[in-house]
Amino acid sequence: MYHDYASKLLADYRSDPPLWESDLPRHNRYSDNILNSRYCGNKNGAEPVYNESTNSPGKAERGLQLSDLRNFSFMLNPQHKNIGYGDAQDLEPYSSIPKNKLFNNFKNHRPAFSTHTENLIRRNVVRTEKKTFPQVASLKSTQKHCLTQPSSLPSLKNPKNISVPSARFSEHTKFFSYEDLPKLKTKGAIKHEQHLGDQMSGQYYNGYIPHKDVYNILCLAHNLPASVEKVIAGRGIPLGNPHVKPNIEQELIKSACAYTGIPIGPLPSKDLQHGREYQEFSANRHMLQVSNILHSVFANHSIKPQILEDIPTLNAQLTSIKPISPFLNKAYQTHYMENIVTLVPRFKSIANYSSPIPNYSKRDSGQAEYFDTSKQTISRHNNYIPKYTGGIGDSKLDTTFPKDFNASSVPLTSAEKDHSLRGDNSACCISSISPSL
């Protein structure tokens, strides 16, 4: 069923001309209430997809329909009530990137990425309804391509004065392309203000660019599977059946370990007191810390290759983040740092379009097979399989661990417990970054 849905979804996107070109009024016809009820997630994932005409969950089992796709609008998080992600094809005409330069490598692999991820790759700017946010600024010299009236998308008059609420909001909604990545600048950690609607008071917000977007780009550049709708924040809108929420976190952890050579440590056996829940909790927390390290480095060094290659500077960045991981005792931390340092040169490709694409092969079963190294079995997920070269169960990785190391004996600090158990975006924040204008 998932395969059939994905095929229809991709056929809609690939149609020439796009199926929704003759249906543009649909983009402005939804009320805020319908948008909220259909697309806002909650702390446990996503609410059911509501029927378009009745606004009731009567047909939620069918998942998102093609009519929904033409008005695709994902929320940045449950508190961002009205900020939507625009349709991929709608935003493509005013992309600042030559199409053949960005999408050549994706032609044969496009089905491997979820629709949400395709939106993330293609999108430069958020399209919002005129009546909801009249202050949204468009990209330079692109107003004539916007779906709404140009008057509803005024240019940013004073981009340097970020204290103005409209300017702050405009910076937030200007999403970056690959060309913008080298220009990212650090603004320092800011305390999240109430300029984006109802937020949790005192929550730290990860800059003007959503953490999820940055993480998707990093995954693409590092050959990791790009379907990470709910990796860090633990929330998102699953495609297909809204009641099926695959454990994308575990998929990312296993693939990240395979590509980076950073093992997540010896997992406790299932017959221990905490069992599988403890393993998953610890592995998720470990990958969160790995991503925090990488994000902190990129934010503070503006993704400049000459700085990324400065290993002493990078080492200083990495060693300043404590604690490293509950899995890694003091004897193992040095080896862990060396592994992180070897990752950095791979990310230079972010700045020059040369990020490699994972090698996917289609299976006759119509599903993907991911090796679960903890069970030495195969678990099915979707239509394609990344060809990994190693994994957590690789004997080469296992021999590097101290034989007497017991992960379950490592106590958690109060800060770790607070960050790991909170389950909201505050656990994912490093330092603020925003596009330079």
UniProtKB/Swiss-Prot annotation:
The keyword Plastid does not apply. The keyword Ion transport does not apply. It is found in: Virion. It comes from the Viruses. Induction: Expressed in the late phase of the viral replicative cycle. Keywords: Late protein, Virion. GO terms for cellular component: virion component. Its main location: virion. Belongs to the asfivirus p49 structural protein family. Together with the penton and the other minor capsid proteins (M1249L, p17), forms a complicated network immediately below the outer capsid shell, stabilizing the whole capsid. Plays an essential role in the formation of infectious virus particles. Especially required for the formation of the capsid vertices. During virion assembly, associates with the membrane and probably mediates the docking of the penton complex to the inner membrane, where it recruits the capsomers to form the penton core. This is Minor capsid protein p49. It comes from African swine fever virus (isolate Tick/Malawi/Lil 20-1/1983) (ASFV).
